[in-house]
């Protein structure tokens, strides 16, 4: 079966990435939030593509540990991570703005020159992600979205990280399963630590 027609749901994460690189690079970018999923994806991507395009969204309120992990990722994986600034010099920081229009606007700017983007979302992270396909059309932006780890479990991630001795975000060792901006993130399993106490589990990027 040719790479153009193979069913990506039946192949490995590495094969999904290889397909994405073959089909879309250089108009392909990976979104990086420096969590355990990105530890795995960056390792796989740099094994597949010698010049990957990777970007992150800087809200101005990231954990210091996130900034440290950023540096470690660049050093270990030999990549220069593009910074998309979500801060506004004209408006004060608020959770509503940061977790809504600011991040979404920054993502749009980060993806303006691509035909596909790679994300680390996984189906087991919650009901809003349970239907994620390994390759799906992002109708909101008119491009493709690649989710190589869609069928991975938490155990799969840690097994891969330890087998390959990969750097990972230190807050994972302090009970943070999902890590976003400092004001909006607390320890917790799954995504329960994000916007704790609020009826919210997504910022809009993956909706």
What function would you assign to each model-found segment?
Residues 1-207:
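Nucleotide-activated chemistry modules centered on ATP-dependent adenylation/adenylyltransferase
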């Amino acid at each position: 079966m040719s790479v153009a027609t193979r069913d990506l749901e039946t192949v490995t994460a590495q094969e999904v990435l290889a397909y994405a690189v073959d089909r879309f690079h250089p108009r392909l970018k990976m979104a990086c939030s420096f969590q355990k999923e990105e530890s795995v994806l960056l390792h796989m991507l740099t094994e597949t593509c010698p010049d990957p395009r990777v970007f992150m969204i800087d809200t101005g309120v990231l954990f210091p540990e996130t900034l440290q992990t950023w540096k470690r990722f660049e050093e270990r994986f030999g990549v220069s991570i593009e910074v998309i600034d979500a801060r506004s010099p004209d408006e004060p920081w608020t959770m509503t703005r940061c977790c809504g229009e600011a991040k979404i606007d920054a993502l749009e700017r980060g993806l303006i020159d691509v035909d596909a983007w790679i994300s680390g979302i996984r189906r087991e992270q919650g009901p809003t992600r349970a239907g994620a396909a390994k390759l799906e059309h992002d109708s909101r932006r008119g491009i493709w979205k690649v989710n190589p780890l869609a069928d991975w479990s938490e155990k799969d991630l840690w097994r891969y990280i330890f087998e390959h001795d990969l750097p990972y975000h230190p807050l994972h060792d302090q009970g943070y399963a999902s890590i976003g901006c400092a004001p909006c993130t607390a320890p917790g399993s799954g995504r329960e630590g994000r916007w704790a106490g609020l009826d919210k589990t997504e910022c809009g990027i993956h909706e």
